[in-house]
């Protein structure tokens, strides 16, 4: 499969689409995929959220949205855009292309956030419960909170893990 392509102009994308013998745009998954990978508005917009097990729209695509999760209204807007801009009208093939693009662009918001953090060297676990709850700052409290936090973090990285 072609991975994410750099965005191109709409005219360049149209020129690269497969056509029928009569010169119309071929209603194919490949054409839909090409549009989702190269269109300046749609390129990089759809991703699979591993945490929620849903397809998300992760960047603005020209209409108001309440949530990142791809919903029926979003599909209608996408269908309208593809029909008006590229002449692509086969809903099933468009949906299949969305599935492929989302699968190629997976993310996990918690893992991504945790992986982006850089430790500044300050010891926080030892004094966290004392600061917020007034607990003793002893070795037992430290080890208990450390175990709890390590378990929470390991669950984000190893799906289904019950404990450390």
Q: Could you say what each language-model-derived stretch is?
A:
Residues 162-164:
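Conserved small/polar residues in nucleotide/adenosyl-binding loops
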Residues 136-157:
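N-terminal pre-Walker A segment at the start of P-loop NTPase domains
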